[in-house]
Amino acid sequence: MYMKLFLHLKSSSGIGLLLVIMLFLPQCRSINIPESTNSANLKVGKYDSPTHFAGIYANAKMKYAFNGSSLRDFEKWQKAFRPELKKLLGLNILEAQFAAYKPKAEMLSSEDIDFAIREHWLIWTEPTVPLPFILLRPKNADQPRGLVIAPHGHSKNTELYAGIYNSEEERASGEEGERDVAIQAVKEGYFAIAPTTRGFGETRTQEDIKKDATSSCRTLLMHDILVGRTPIGDRVWDISKLIDWAFANLPVDQQKVVVTGNSGGGTVTLFAAACDTRISVAVPSSYFCTFTGSIGSIHHCECNYVPGIMQLGEMADVAGLIAPRPFCAVHGKLDKIFPIEESRKAFDHLKQIYTAAGVPDNCELYEGAEGHRYYKDGVWPFVKKHLSQNKE
């Protein structure tokens, strides 16, 4: 076919067009399309979404996918990547708009729960965002001690992590799944903050509150992206403002700041630690995976998505921004929405980053025996081991 076209153009005045075609054809051949996982559909002309997006993912630029090996490679990569990630999340917009803003907070109630004092608070992380949080104070906490911030995932009960249940069934389920994360933290001797994750609870839209919807994540995403912000960026901002407040108002050992949460709380944990270097230890549960093998191929809430994230890198690259600080991914072997095989793949890449940073032992993957839940046995020994290495 190409020879006939060549002879036709050669015999006419289309030599310029011929040159264009000759230049263009090699580019067509260079497009990387992976072998189809469903070639039968392609043969009969059917659209196959996994095949289509596998090709798109394979051709994503991933400008900051780590491929170095030395400490110098690592430091140069991290210095360039972090500001680009923060920009993509919309944090640069928040930082510019609220550069001089100091969040205010108000305590609403306080109660003695035997082993701790439990306080309900509001903090205005933005002038128009009163964010509820629960503070658990260890009794006789006069000396500086560590702080644990525990963002929750997708749940109607935003106070579950603080040991507040709406029914006995919820209590049984919460305790079985070890979801009383802030209670665990205060029993370990830390100040514990259990914040409402933005888009849930009192931070839902009024319409969603009336409908008793679990969240307003979709509305939050759609409205955020109009101005270059994202729900993940908003939630990272909230964590940073809580750290600001805690440093100013509690006797916190500022070298011992931990963030840990399950599922959507794991998302917040990973991105917050990647962006805010004041976080000493990060332990996301039921989240760390590959983007392609989880939110890129399995149905998830809209709040998980950051437009263009894979033009920068994969999830392991984002987690690599936490290095050299300790990071432990806690994950269930039977998790169906963040498959463990993809988590292991991501961890192999993350281990390369931590090795280049000179601290291969500062990252771990703890595998629980069950599915999508919190595994406290993978959290607190890791936290204790690494915080004990931080001097007072």
Predicted regions and their residues:
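Mobile cap/lid helix-loop segments that gate and shape the active-site cleft of serine hydrolases
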Residues: 219-227, 241, 279-320, 324, ...
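C-terminal catalytic histidine-bearing segment of alpha/beta-hydrolase fold enzymes
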Residues: 348-392
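Alpha/beta-hydrolase fold nucleophile elbow
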Residues: 251-262
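Gly/Ala-rich beta-loop-alpha elbow adjacent to hydrolase catalytic centers
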Residues: 261-265, 269
